[in-house]
Amino acid sequence: MSKKLTFQEIILTLQQYWNDQGCMLMQAYDNEKGAGTMSPYTFLRAIGPEPWNAAYVEPSRRPADGRYGENPNRLYQHHQFQVVMKPSPSNIQELYLESLEKLGINPLEHDVRFVEDNWENPSTGSAGLGWEVWLDGMEITQFTYFQQVGGLATGPVTAEVTYGLERLASYIQEVDSVYDIEWAPGVKYGEIFLQPEYEHSKYSFEVSDQDMLLENFEKFEKEAGRALELGLVHPAYDYVLKCSHTFNLLDARGAVSVTERAGYIARIRNLARVVAKTFVAERKKLGYPLLDEATRKKLLAEEEE
């Protein structure tokens, strides 16, 4: 690698590359979530028959992973670059390897391995065949072919490529700590994110009001259900995301037992499944507008039979 790309140059390079492959460039979704997969741009769009190709950066919050800014590689919040393509291109792995070349990483000169790691997200009823991508011994990407999302079988199959931007940048810039990553010329990652990392860790582990969080979970769950009764998929899903983040805060605080934990996850999953079913039904009512006309008419005719 000749030039060491800054963090923002890595993002710009990936955006341009996947734009050239036909992906829409979406923006980060404005609700807390634990992974880019939970964005409606993946979760909702991976189900149903309509095509969908999108790429976006997603800040992902995982309260239990916070380490007060003292761990060089483990974070309360990290950034993912998410690519979803439906139907999955037959050459998606080749496209991914080409994206590494655009970042200055020649796969022929490095040990790039696809290590089987089937993916599952119990709280959203989602699963798929997957691989971790290891670059010279470090995981930098999760590769998944969705089989089920929101409890629904997927078809056509969606391919998801999730780059861990901090790990990728650490490798490209040859630094041992994420806080030493150059975000932009002259500005280090730690100068932007070290203080919030410490504060969010302190809040998650020591300060958060458990009673308030428990009460909020109940309210968010109830409101999600109420929105679903009215057929309002997107507001309902926003409250599912709020339930998920609230549960993660409770979990980090040690406020839920092992048995309670399973119960909370099941409650979130049940809501997510209803959201998924309702979304597909609403898209059908709209006539699957993202399908080409011939496919749309054929599919709607088949579903009427």
Swiss-Prot record:
HAMAP family, alphabetized: Gly_tRNA_synth_alpha
User: Which organism does this sequence originate in?
Assistant: Streptococcus thermophilus (strain ATCC BAA-250 / LMG 18311)
List, alphabetically, the GO terms of the cellular component aspect. Answer: cytosol
Pfam hit, one: tRNA-synt_2e
Biological processes per GO annotation? glycyl-tRNA aminoacylation
Major place of residence: cytoplasm
Single Gene Ontology MF annotation:
transferase activity
Keywords, ordered alphabetically: Aminoacyl-tRNA synthetase, ATP-binding, Cytoplasm, Ligase, Nucleotide-binding, Protein biosynthesis
Q: Which Gene3D superfamilies match?
A: Bira Bifunctional Protein, Domain 2 (3.30.930.10), Class II aaRS and biotin synthetases, domain 2 (1.20.58.180)
For this protein, the parts annotated as crossing the membrane are: none
Assembly with partners or alone:
Tetramer of two alpha and two beta subunits.
Going by the entry's taxonomy, the superkingdom of the source organism is recorded as: Bacteria
InterPro entries in the record: aa-tRNA-synth_II/BPL/LPL (IPR045864), Gly-tRNA-synth_heterodimer (IPR006194), Gly-tRNA_ligase_asu (IPR002310)
**What family does the Swiss-Prot or TrEMBL record give for this protein?**
Belongs to the class-II aminoacyl-tRNA synthetase family.
Enzyme Commission number(s) = 6.1.1.14
Gene from which this protein is expressed? glyQ
Subcellular locations according to the entry? Cytoplasm
Could you tell me what this protein is called?
Glycine--tRNA ligase alpha subunit
Q: According to its UniProt record, which reaction does this protein catalyse?
A: tRNA(Gly) + glycine + ATP = glycyl-tRNA(Gly) + AMP + diphosphate
